[in-house]
């Protein structure tokens, strides 16, 4: 049998200390020869940094750990592996603890074993440290040699550490975020009272913080919680209160702002309650002399000096003073109410007059604005998609523009736009556009009927390719006569001005706005013909 054989069987027949010494020395020399110059056992960080009493490697090996690298005591991977003279391998701390606790014998075969007979198995240590293990952190799929595990764990982004505030295990990469945003024991400052508390009691603090904003349940007024009780007891106009005469028998309850009206409406009833109360007090007071007539002189003197009798008289005087005070207050309140009613009527008349003046000023402003257009008016039809949806649903859409003048002085006109429904005869899904004359400020200064050229256009807001139609007025039509009502019911224009399909295909609608332009030139303008634009024959109004 060769002494340098590293298999367990090489130690089965060893029975003397001298044989052990020579064999152990030879094996130690051979094992050291297997280690590279940079892989001396003393330089392996995983084993050298471990406490001497630590058990084996409790890690997940991939592939699973072979039984020859498993400590028979802790059943984990051999840590700081040592060998016994009988050829068994143990963790250094495990076998030493076993010898101290259970006696000087090998736990496997019960052979006599002393601590000084143990020697490091550097060959097994190197093999174990070269095995592949998985990171034990949840969510991490990294694999590495066992010797690299400690370094990886110190850098693993899935590594966890206990929160110093709540002791919850948290990934190290999220620890700062946890301490500042999620930890239930993090310190918070109340924005209302500037007090400090842990987040776990935040809800309780918010419910009882005296400086927190709250809302009165009666009037919905915002105020701090510390003022809420006083507000409800003295100031809140909608808080329920008892009648001032509740001590005299009135059982009515109402809101504080209705108390004055109740006091005014039920004055007689309150006086009746007061009279009944005083009568009962007077009767109770009068029964005392009749009862005193049957008493001896000494008893009558004692009765006269009775504190109850004095107290009743004092209460009666106080009640009479209260009645006089309330009657005076009632008279003053009646006078104030009458004055307030007169003042209120005056203010109502003033408000009505101011509203009338406001309407007149608004009308004058619109009239002045209309006179500034000088016959060229651009009408912004906003929210046009809404009108299109109603048109598609079969609802007739009729829109009128604000009025405008052809000059100063000039004719007052407005535009009328129809979105014809899909079921309309001969003009379905068309835009119809007409011009109407209106009663204006300068009608008496103008010649009638209106004569001239009218140019209508729907503006292309993207490419500038506007849809334009030009028409001449016809003096014999009612549409151009001087209107006898605010707006001439007869219009002049085109029933089929523009198809809605063409409207959608081009840039006529931008930001949900359609622009319609009208240019009116009283008296015929020959320049239109010189520009090559021939008037299109108008169509009768519908």
UniProtKB/Swiss-Prot annotation:
Residues 311-373 form a coiled coil. A zinc finger (TRAF-type) spans 151-203, 204-260. Homotrimer. Homooligomer. It comes from Danio rerio (Zebrafish). It is found in: Cytoplasm; Cytoplasm, Cell cortex; Nucleus; Lipid droplet. The keyword Membrane does not apply. Substrate binds at residues 489-496. A zinc finger (RING-type) spans 71-110. GO terms for molecular function: signaling adaptor activity; tumor necrosis factor receptor binding; ubiquitin protein ligase activity; ubiquitin-protein transferase activity; zinc ion binding. Residues 32-54 are annotated as: Disordered. The lineage of its organism: Eukaryota, Metazoa, Chordata, Craniata, Vertebrata. Its main location: cytoplasm. The coiled coil domain mediates homo- and hetero-oligomerization. The MATH/TRAF domain binds to receptor cytoplasmic domains. Pfam families: TRAF-mep_MATH, zf-C3HC4, zf-TRAF. Residues 35-52 have a biased composition (Polar residues). Belongs to the TNF receptor-associated factor family. A subfamily. Keywords: Coiled coil, Cytoplasm, Lipid droplet, Metal-binding, Nucleus, Repeat, Transferase, Ubl conjugation pathway, Zinc, Zinc-finger. Transmembrane segments: none annotated. One of its GO terms (biological process) is response to bacterium. This is TNF receptor-associated factor 6. It comes from the Eukaryota.
């Amino acid at each position: 049998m060769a002494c340098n054989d590293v298999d367990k069987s090489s130690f089965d027949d060893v029975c003397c200390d001298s044989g052990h010494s020579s064999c152990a020395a030879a094996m130690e020399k051979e094992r050291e020869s297997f280690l590279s110059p940079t892989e001396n056992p003393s330089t392996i960080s995983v084993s050298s940094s471990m406490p001497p009493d630590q058990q084996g490697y409790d890690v997940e090996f991939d592939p699973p750990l072979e039984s020859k690298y498993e400590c028979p005591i802790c059943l984990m991977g051999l840590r700081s592996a040592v060998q016994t003279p009988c050829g068994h391998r143990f963790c250094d701390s495990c076998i030493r603890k076993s010898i101290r606790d259970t006696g000087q014998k090998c736990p496997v075969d019960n052979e006599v074993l002393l601590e000084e007979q143990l020697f490091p198995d550097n060959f097994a240590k190197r093999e174990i440290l070269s095995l592949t293990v998985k990171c034990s952190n949840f969510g991490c799929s990294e694999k590495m040699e066992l010797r690299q595990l400690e370094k990886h764990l110190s850098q693993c982004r899935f590594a966890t550490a206990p929160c110093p505030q709540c002791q919850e295990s948290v990934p190290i990469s999220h620890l700062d975020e946890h301490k500042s945003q999620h930890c239930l024991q993090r310190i918070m400052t109340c924005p209302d009272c500037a007090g400090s508390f842990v987040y776990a009691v935040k809800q309780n603090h918010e419910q009882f913080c005296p400086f927190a904003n709250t809302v009165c349940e009666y009037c919905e007024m915002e105020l701090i919680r510390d003022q809420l009780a006083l507000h409800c007891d003295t100031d809140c106009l909608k808080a329920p209160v008892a009648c001032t005469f509740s001590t005299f028998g009135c059982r009515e309850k109402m809101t504080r702002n209705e108390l004055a009206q109740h006091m005014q409406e039920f004055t007689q009833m309150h006086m009746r309650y007061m009279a009944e109360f005083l009568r009962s007090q007077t009767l109770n007071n009068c029964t005392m002399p009749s009862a005193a007539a049957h008493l001896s002189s000494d008893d009558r003197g004692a009765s006269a000096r009775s504190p109850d009798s004095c107290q009743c008289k004092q209460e009666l005087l106080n009640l009479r003073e209260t009645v006089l005070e309330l009657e005076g207050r009632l008279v003053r309140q009646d006078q104030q109410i009458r004055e307030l009613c007169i003042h209120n009527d005056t203010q109502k008349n003033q408000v009505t007059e101011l509203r009338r003046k406001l309407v007149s000023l608004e009308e004058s402003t619109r009239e002045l604005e209309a006179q500034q257009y000088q016959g060229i008016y651009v009408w912004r039809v906003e929210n046009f998609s809404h009108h299109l949806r109603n048109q598609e649903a079969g609802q007739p859409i009729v829109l009128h523009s604000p009025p405008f003048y052809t000059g100063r002085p000039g004719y007052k006109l407005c535009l009328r736009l129809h979105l014809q429904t899909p079921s309309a005869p001969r003009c379905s899904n068309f835009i119809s556009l007409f011009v109407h004359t209106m009663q204006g400020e300068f009608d008496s200064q103008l010649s009638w009927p209106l004569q001239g050229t009218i140019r209508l256009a729907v503006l292309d807001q993207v490419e500038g390719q506007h849809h334009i139609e030009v028409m001449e007025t016809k003096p014999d039509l009612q549409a151009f006569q001087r209107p006898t009502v605010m707006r001439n019911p007869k219009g002049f224009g085109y029933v089929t001005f523009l198809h809605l399909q063409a409207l959608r295909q081009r840039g006529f609608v931008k930001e949900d706005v359609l622009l319609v332009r009208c240019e009116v030139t009283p008296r015929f303008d020959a320049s239109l013909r010189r520009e090559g634009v021939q008037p299109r024959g108008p169509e009768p109004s519908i």
